[in-house]
Regions:
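Outer membrane beta-barrel transmembrane domains
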Residues: 254-311, 437-472, 484
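Flexible glycine-rich, low-complexity coil/linker segments exposed to the extracellular/periplasmic environment
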Residues: 373-405
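Outer membrane beta-barrel
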Residues: 118-242, 250-254, 258-262, 266, ...
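Beta-barrel outer-membrane channel/assembly domains of diderm bacteria
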Residues: 19, 24-25, 29-185, 222-226, ...
Length: 518
């Protein structure tokens, strides 16, 4: 997703770099208590409709930056600058959620065809002061004002809010073989590849700008880093910036170790401890028969480990190949929970071909709760990065299915049509990991005929959920102005069709947005 210029989020990139980001989505409409059973959800922009960063080729083609108009003071080691980001996004949706609302909540007056406009502005100011021995005292203050004009996909009308985004002070050493970086206050933090810790802020609903999702910073953050040329050790305490209407009062702490080679290959391990949470979990009914059970405060006490790695080659026999891998394991003895999730990805860039096409295959799997065991196996995706090339599973479907009880095969073909124009085609085959187990939060609990009579079930009776296609176009006008447009469709699979009386329609949509970024 598009981010502001440095000082940026603390993203675990090249050690020694100077420091400068989940969707709370539910199958609308549904029982509010069940909708909250995600345990907090993910709060980024949705995987389609949000602004995209330019590709490296596009960025290289942009005109030189020239005079830095954002720096307004630079004297005696003190440098101060302003930041500004803004965007407008026009969205159209047809047959939202495959028209499920007309079947399971016919009295809710939910419109499955919507058009809306959304926008945001994100101004900020930052400084850094170079002191003796190379130490740098730095800080940043920014805010987000967001709004939706009309009714969005989750039936929220004219939502708007102005909130603090970042507001931190920090101290960094830079002249030693091993350096320290300490900061306190709201700011962005992404660990690993963004599988569990990436987006600390929630947009949409009463705050507006559902698709853009401009909020990324954690509401409270204390972050310390020790790094040398290749290795980085991070310790953190964070609280997400949650919606007032769905505040799980989450607090997390942990560590991250990352080792990176000169070739930018890396491997790392993140540990997460949920110190406090009111966010509930959901458990499948025994043998999948009956309504799911809510576990109040289920996330409280969760332990999670995330191993991640990435390798790419620019020369030799394996040049132009990319391989990444992520594996997460979660446990919570208090509620007898044990879950896992992971991703394997391989890609190749045809560097000598016209348009330099790159083809990437991704396999993802996130455990679902097995209704035949007493243990809770439902994976908690926490605060993942929800952009198309990160952890969104599908395009349309990711507005319904968060990364739990899912498995998916994904293909992406990206082409650099001109130095300023990029085109990406994405396809996703999405299936349920466990049958008779909640796919999302428990909506569509329904009676079905069984040999023993009618029983209630949640989830699906067939694995295949949907096939998603998404075509995205990105144009860079200059280093500050970007345009993104896309069209997408989700074709219901056997699992969705079996839960829908009659013929389930194809869910389609389109968007176009413009973003200004300084």
């Amino acid at each position: 997703m598009l981010e502001m210029p440095p000082p940026m989020a603390i993203v675990q990139s090249a050690p020694g770099d100077r420091c400068g980001g989940q969707q709370r989505c539910h199958m609308a409409p549904g029982p509010q208590l069940l909708a909250q059973a995600t345990g907090g959800g993910a709060s980024a922009s949705l995987p389609e409709g949000g602004p995209s960063t330019p590709t490296s080729a596009q960025a290289a083609a942009a005109p030189p930056a020239g005079r830095d108009i954002t720096t307004f003071y630079d004297r005696d080691g003190l440098k101060a600058r302003w930041y500004f980001q803004a965007g407008l996004n026009l969205v159209a949706e047809r047959h939202l959620f495959w028209d499920f609302a007309s079947v399971y909540s016919p009295g809710a007056d939910f419109n499955s065809d919507e058009n809306w406009l959304e926008g945001y502005v994100k101004p900020g100011i930052g400084f850094d002061k170079t002191m003796a021995r190379g130490h740098v005292f730095y800080g940043k203050l920014s805010a987000v004002a967001s709004r939706t004009w009309g009714t969005d996909a989750f039936d929220a009308t004219n939502g708007h809010a102005t909130t603090l985004e970042e507001g931190y002070l920090g101290l960094r050493s830079a002249a030693n073989a091993t350096n320290l970086d300490l900061s306190l206050g709201p700011r962005e933090l992404e660990l690993g590849d963004g599988m569990l810790i990436a987006n600390g802020g929630t947009s949409g609903f009463e705050r507006g700008a559902l698709k853009f999702g401009p909020r990324k910073a954690w509401r409270h953050a204390a972050i310390g880093r020790m790094f040398d040329r290749r290795a980085t050790l991070t310790g953190y305490f964070i609280e997400p910036n949650e919606l007032p209407s769905n505040n799980g009062h989450n607090q997390l702490a942990g560590t991250d170790f990352r080792y990176q080679t000169d070739a930018k290959d890396y491997i790392g391990l993140t540990y997460i401890k949920v110190l406090r949470s009111d966010s509930p979990y959901i458990r499948a009914a025994r043998d999948g028969l009956g309504a799911p059970t809510i576990i109040p405060g289920g996330r409280d006490g969760l332990n999670a480990w995330n191993l991640y790695l990435s390798a790419t080659r620019t020369q030799g026999a394996l040049r132009n190949w990319l391989v990444t891998g992520d594996l997460a394991y979660e446990t919570n003895r208090r509620i007898n929970m044990e879950a896992w999730g992971g991703r394997a990805q391989i890609g190749y860039t045809f560097a000598q071909a016209a348009w330099k096409p790159s083809l990437t295959y991704t396999y993802k799997r996130f455990s679902g709760d097995n209704p035949r065991t007493a243990k809770l196996e439902r994976f908690d995706p926490l605060y993942y990065e929800g952009s198309p090339d990160a952890w969104a599973t599908g395009s349309k479907s990711s507005m319904v299915f968060i990364n739990t009880n899912l498995k998916a095969h994904e293909l992406a073909l990206a082409m650099q049509v001109t130095p300023k124009d990029a085109l990406t085609f994405r396809y996703a085959y999405i299936a349920a990991d466990k049958l008779g187990s909640p796919i999302q939060f428990g909506q569509a609990t329904r009676p079905v005929s069984t040999p023993s009579g009618f029983n209630q079930i949640a989830g699906v009776t067939k694995h295949h959920l949907s096939d998603d296609v998404f075509v995205e176009y990105n144009h860079i006008y200059n280093q500050h102005l970007f345009l993104t447009a896309g069209i997408s469709a989700s074709f219901p699979g056997a699992g969705i069709k079996a839960a829908f009386p009659g013929k389930a329609p194809t869910w389609t949509g389109a968007f176009v947005n413009v973003v200004v970024n300084y």
